[in-house]
Regions:
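A surface-exposed partner-binding patch
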Residues: 149-252
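A short, surface-exposed interaction/processing loop segment used at functional sites
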Residues: 256-279
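Ankyrin-repeat boundary/"N-cap" motif
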Residues: 13-22, 45-54, 76-86, 108-122, ...
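Well-ordered alpha/beta subsegment
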Residues: 274, 284-290
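A generic tandem-repeat structural signature
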Residues: 1-58
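The conserved C-terminal loop/turn that links adjacent ankyrin repeats
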Residues: 9-11, 39-43, 72-75, 102-106, ...
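Acidic, serine/proline-rich, intrinsically disordered low-complexity segments
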Residues: 91-92, 104-107, 114, 118, ...
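Ankyrin repeat structural motif
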Residues: 1-7, 27-37, 60-70, 90-100, ...
């Protein structure tokens, strides 16, 4: 028992498994109060950076969430990560607890699960959960915050092909986001060739690539292209999807004035060719990636 361990000099703040995390994950208030009284650190993280809120959620000890908050590990200061992680569980009672205690609803710090800096709303959009998206928006979630690679909830809905969700976000966004002149101004620094602009304004943006490992490629309409930064370099995402390769994106690189492929997982950029060369034989150009 906890008492026996304390009496025999156990380190309550062991770096691998701090006692406070074990208590909130597996035990009740009596044990939690006991370890805290004997010096357990309420802000402790374990070896994989899990905090008390996450530990209680892993153990489904939802009744301990309020205790953790009341002991001083506050939702406002520390609850963002656990809140974002619990979005995919669709447990609205738990989400209400965090929101009622002033969680940062737009929390978007990177971690091992979400290195690409999504907000909880972006996570809900990625799971194509419109009900959750509406719930978060009703509680103040910002629809304009982008992930590390420029994707915002609207762009995610477009990528997922969920037009109902895309329309929902579009109606919440500033009108200039969907204004052509505004988009052209935004794209000026990218120095897009005229032929690329007219291609992206055209109706034919989906291509089957039967002889290629990529199977198919679909481009984003001009208005939905996504500017983002790779280090200090500006890139423009052009592809909506590249067959089964979810981590690859076809981008325009204004520095080289060429089409390139951005590998999201490894954060690498592979230069391909000029746009007219790319469009004349997409399958062959893409094969060079292997």
């Amino acid at each position: 028992s906890a008492q026996w361990l304390v009496e025999h000099g156990a380190d309550l703040n062991d770096e691998e498994n701090p006692s406070f995390l074990l208590a909130v994950r597996y035990a009740d208030q009596k044990v939690i109060d006991y370890v805290v009284e004997h010096g357990a650190n309420i802000h402790a993280l374990n070896s994989v950076d899990v905090d008390a809120f996450q530990a209680a959620l892993y153990g489904k000890r939802y009744e301990n969430l309020q205790l953790i908050h009341d002991l001083g590990h506050s939702v406002q200061k520390y609850g963002g990560r656990a809140f974002r992680n619990v979005i995919t569980d669709q447990n609205y009672e738990v989400l209400d607890f965090f929101i009622n205690n002033s969680v940062d609803i737009n929390y978007n710090k990177p971690d091992s699960v979400y290195p690409f800096k999504p907000t909880p709303l972006c996570v809900a959009a990625r799971y194509v959960d419109l009900q959750m998206c509406k719930y978060l928006v009703e509680h103040g979630a910002d629809v304009t915050i982008t992930e590390k690679d420029g994707m915002r909830p609207y762009s995610i809905a477009i990528e997922k092909g969920d037009m109902e969700m895309a329309e929902y976000f579009k109606n919440l966004e500033p009108a200039e986001y969907h204004d052509k002149q505004n988009k052209m101004d935004q794209l000026k620094p990218f120095k897009l060739p005229k032929v690329l602009i007219s291609f992206l304004e055209g109706d034919n943006l989906y291509f089957e690539l039967p002889d290629s490992d990529f199977i198919s490629i679909e481009f984003l309409p001009l208005l939905d292209t996504v500017p983002f930064k790779w280090g200090r370099r500006k890139l423009l995402r052009l592809s909506k999807e590249l067959g089964e390769y979810n981590d690859y994106q076809i981008v325009w690189d204004p520095k080289s004035k060429k089409i390139s492929c951005y590998d999201m997982e490894h954060q690498e950029l592979r230069e391909l060719c000029k746009f007219d060369e790319f469009i004349s034989d997409m399958a062959e150009q893409l094969e060079t990636l292997f």
